[in-house]
A protein has these predicted regions:
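Extended ligand-binding regions for polar small-molecule ligands
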Residues: 67, 147, 151-174
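Short helix-loop capping/hinge motifs at secondary-structure junctions, enriched
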Residues: 55-65, 142-144, 155-161
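Beta-alpha-beta core module
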Residues: 35-41, 45-47, 107-155
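Short hydrophobic/charged patches on amphipathic alpha-helices used for structural packing
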Residues: 15, 19, 66, 109-110
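Central regulatory/effector-binding core of bacterial HTH transcription factors
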Residues: 1-34, 94, 102-103
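Secondary-structure junction motif
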Residues: 72-94, 158-167
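Beta->alpha turn/N-cap motifs
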Residues: 10-11, 27-32, 53-54, 105, ...
Length: 174
C-alpha cells in the first residue's frame, strides 16, 4: 500500500524542500523556478482576482483595474516571483500601492479581508474556500492568469512508488 503525504507551502518552500530531498514531487503555481526539475504544465490556468466584502463599492464592478486598487490596503502573496508578476501588472503604479500585509496562505488573507483589514490579491482557485456571504472576488483587468506545474528533481533515483507516479504524470505529455 502506498500512502501519499500532502504538504501545503509556498512554491519557494516546496522547491527548497525538494532540493533537500524532503519532498519528491511538487505542485507549483507559476511563476516558479524550475531549474534542475523535470515537469509538466497542466493546461488549465487560473485567473488572478481581488477579494472584498459583498457590500464594498468594488463588489458592484464586473472586474477590477489597477486604478481601483491604488488607494486600497492590499494583501499580496508572499512569494517574490508572484509579487514581481503583480508589479509588472501594476506597472509604474506599483510603488504607489498601499501594501498592508503579505500572506503565504490565501485563506488567511481572506480572513483578514472579512474583518476589513485589506483586499487580498489571489488566484481564483484559492478563493473557493472563502465564504461568499462574507467575501466576494472580482477578476483583475487586464486579466492575469497563471498555470500549474507538477515537478520532480531531475536525474535522481526514486522509490518504485514515486517512479511509477512520475511515469503516470509523464503519460499526460504524450
Amino acid at each position: 500500500m502506498v500512502q501519499i503525504a500532502l504538504h501545503t507551502a509556498t512554491a519557494d518552500s516546496v522547491y527548497d524542500m525538494m532540493n533537500q530531498g524532503l519532498v519528491d514531487i511538487g505542485l507549483f503555481m507559476e511563476p516558479v523556478n524550475t531549474e534542475g526539475l523535470d515537469y509538466i504544465r497542466i493546461m488549465d490556468s487560473d485567473h488572478w482576482v481581488v477579494g472584498m466584502k459583498p457590500d464594498d463599492p468594488l463588489a458592484c464592478k464586473e472586474y477590477i483595474t489597477r486604478d481601483d486598487l491604488i488607494d486600497k490596503p492590499l494583501i499580496l502573496p508572499k512569494r517574490r516571483n508572484v509579487q514581481s508578476e503583480l508589479a509588472n501588472w501594476f506597472g509604474k503604479d506599483f510603488n504607489k500601492l498601499h501594501i498592508a500585509f503579505i500572506s503565504n496562505l490565501g485563506t488567511n488573507a481572506g480572513v483578514m479581508a472579512t474583518h476589513g483589514l485589506g483586499y487580498p490579491v489571489s488566484i481564483e482557485g484559492a478563493t473557493k474556500y472563502w465564504r461568499e456571504d462574507l467575501l466576494v472576488q472580482r477578476r483583475l483587468y487586464p486579466e492575469i492568469s497563471a498555470s500549474t506545474v507538477i515537478a520532480w528533481r531531475r536525474n535522481i533515483p526514486y522509490s518504485l512508488a514515486v517512479s511509477k507516479f512520475i511515469e503516470e504524470i509523464n503519460a499526460f505529455k504524450a
